[in-house]
Amino acid sequence: MKNVTDSFVSLGDWPYAGSFAFNTDILATNPINLSVVLGVLIFFGKGVLSDLLDNRKQKILSSIRNSEELRAKAIEQLEKARARLRKVEIEADKFRVNGYSEIEREKGNLINSTYENLQRLENYKNEAIQFEQQRTINQVRQRVFQQALQEALETLNSCLNSELHLRTISANIVMLGVMKEITD
């Protein structure tokens, strides 16, 4: 133990300035102290540093895995969105085609119904014209008949005198009698 205490005591003994001597005191020499400190740091710090690096590595790997999972989910959602978009585009095309065909069908129906309405109106017009023609013809016939009857009455009245009138009545009575005998 005396050697240990002597070494501490010798710390107080410094060589004089300008002299050169070899210091055999291990604790007093700086390179040895540094190597010891570095050795202790390496020996004990190696585990701590290794743990820190392992933790950091695990965090980085975990972050990469999470990023990969998020990327995979994003790709999956993108594919689903693209599939929905294609489906919506197909449905839109169907609606567009059906809409155009519906418009064409309605257009055809409208043209057909308009044509039928025009045909009915044409028939009504023709019937009205025929009715008016028939009515006019009947009115003309009736008027001609009335005028002919009026002229015949005027002619008879002007030609008939009482003697001719009596003879016509007698002849008609005889004809009625003969007709009665024939029918009996």
Curated annotation (Swiss-Prot):
Pfam families to which the protein is assigned, alphabetical: ATP-synt_B (PF00430)
Keywords tagged on the record: ATP synthesis, CF(0), Chloroplast, Hydrogen ion transport, Ion transport, Membrane, Plastid, Thylakoid, Transmembrane, Transmembrane helix, Transport
Matching InterPro entries: ATP_synth_b/b'su_bac/chlpt
Membrane topology: Single-pass membrane protein
Annotated transmembrane regions: 27-49
Signal peptide span: none
Protein's cellular compartments: Plastid, Chloroplast thylakoid membrane
Cellular component GO terms, alphabetical: chloroplast thylakoid membrane; proton-transporting ATP synthase complex
One Gene Ontology molecular-function label: proton-transporting ATP synthase activity, rotational mechanism
Assembly behavior: F-type ATPases have 2 components, F(1) - the catalytic core - and F(0) - the membrane proton channel. F(1) has five subunits: alpha(3), beta(3), gamma(1), delta(1), epsilon(1). F(0) has four main subunits: a(1), b(1), b'(1) and c(10-14). The alpha and beta chains form an alternating ring which encloses part of the gamma chain. F(1) is attached to F(0) by a central stalk formed by the gamma and epsilon chains, while a peripheral stalk is formed by the delta, b and b' chains.
Functional summary from the UniProt entry: F(1)F(0) ATP synthase produces ATP from ADP in the presence of a proton or sodium gradient. F-type ATPases consist of two structural domains, F(1) containing the extramembraneous catalytic core and F(0) containing the membrane proton channel, linked together by a central stalk and a peripheral stalk. During catalysis, ATP synthesis in the catalytic domain of F(1) is coupled via a rotary mechanism of the central stalk subunits to proton translocation. Component of the F(0) channel, it forms part of the peripheral stalk, linking F(1) to F(0).
Family of this protein: Belongs to the ATPase B chain family.
Note: In plastids the F-type ATPase is also known as CF(1)CF(0).
Name recorded for this polypeptide: ATP synthase subunit b, chloroplastic
Native source species: Ceratophyllum demersum (Rigid hornwort)
